[in-house]
Amino acid sequence: LSKIYKVANGTADLYVYFYELALNMLKPNGLKGFICSNKFFRAKYGENLREYILQNTTILQIADFNGVKIFEDATVDSAITIFQKQKADNNSTFKVVDVDLINSYLMKQSDLTKTSFSFSNPKELAIKQKIEQIGTPLKEWDININSGIKTGFNEAFIIDEATKNELIKKDPKSAEIIKPLLKGRDIKKYDCIFKELYSIATFPVLKLEINNYTAIKEYLQSFGKRLEQTGEKGSRKKTTNKWFETQDNIAYYKDFEQEKIIFSKASKDTVFYYDKQHFYIDVTAYIISGNNLKYIISILNSLFFKTQFYKFYSGGGIDGEMTIFTLKEFPIPKIDEESQKPFINLVDEILEAKQKIKDYKPLLDEAIKNNNFDREIALKKELENLENICTTNEKIIDQMVYKLYDLTPDEIKIVENSFRN
């Protein structure tokens, strides 16, 4: 396809090629409309198509249903795109139709870039311009963002508490390569729900000798041909890895053993967890490792990030798909260590409160079970106080983030109204 189409990309959905094909079939000044996925507006694979449209067409109208499920059976968000086979001039404008299909506004085609198609009225566009003038894209920070573990066969490599205990009982050495695991759906705002799942961490990069782990070897052998990495029917994808190893190399495995940020690939909310417990993650989540993480997570968990990321930087998808590519594009203001301290202190208080909430809830259950009413009342009051600390600190951070991006009172209203809507 790359030899035939200028919009080609190895990971692109097939509909991308129909845009170029349709344009080639049109007569000069001809019109064409599409109703299809909106993912190419912001996804990395759509960069060639975005550039192609900007260079070869005049956009007439776009309706972007980002975050709105128009077609019940569709697995991604949709869009209506109408363009003309004619190169746009510098002053060319097009109509952006709101999701209600009633309200609309004009936007200059020159305000779109091949990096991303983001549709905004002038006031919203002014906020985006502030974000990009004041902030530095995360890809330029001293951090790494990596995906979770792709095993190729989770039924074998992800185990429960009972299986973990049995393997360690048979061979204590098993504990060396059994790691606590979180999935994307376990991630909450500044928190997580550990469901007592574990990963057998036989990563190819470790070059393990499986005979040194007798219980795990015996356990994995019980899955037979399904663990083979030959690409044959009934086995895993073909790789050069050994039968007992995970599908992906996981060269960054040491990052799991550090403090880090964890977030879900697909979530209806933007929630980030600060991990100090050395959790490993499966392929449904990502990790951020590196420097300035507590300051960064304060921005990522803010209301401002939630609204602006999905409006301008996300890759579409009805479940709020978040990718490494799109997150790396989001600009965060770089400030010195002293200026970061107020953000970090508030995050530390939230993390401490979240941990106490976890510690107190079993005590409350015990008090209720034992009909210890005084204890029950005291614990409920303490839990309420801890929840209030989290809520209050999050609201304070929101206001600090507005100030960080130099938002006016009117711009703050736009941000908060977009969240309510």
Language-model-derived ranges and their functions:
Residues 122-286:
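Polyanion-binding catalytic cores of nucleic-acid enzymes and NTP/SAM-utilizing transferases
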Residues 22-27, 188-193, 198-208, 285-294, ...:
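Proline-centric
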Residues 64, 262-280, 298, 306-317:
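Short, ligand-facing micro-motifs at secondary-structure edges
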Residues 132-142, 153, 215, 222, ...:
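Non-catalytic DNA-recognition/assembly elements of restriction-modification systems
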Residues 1-172, 207, 273-285, 293, ...:
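Signature of N6-adenine DNA methyltransferases within the class I
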Residues 36-40, 66, 85-87, 186, ...:
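Short, flexible loop/turn elements at secondary-structure junctions
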Residues 78-82, 181, 262, 287, ...:
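Conserved hydrophobic/aromatic beta-strand scaffold that supports enzyme active sites
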Residues 51-59, 224-227, 304, 308:
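A short, contiguous, amphipathic alpha-helix enriched in charged residues
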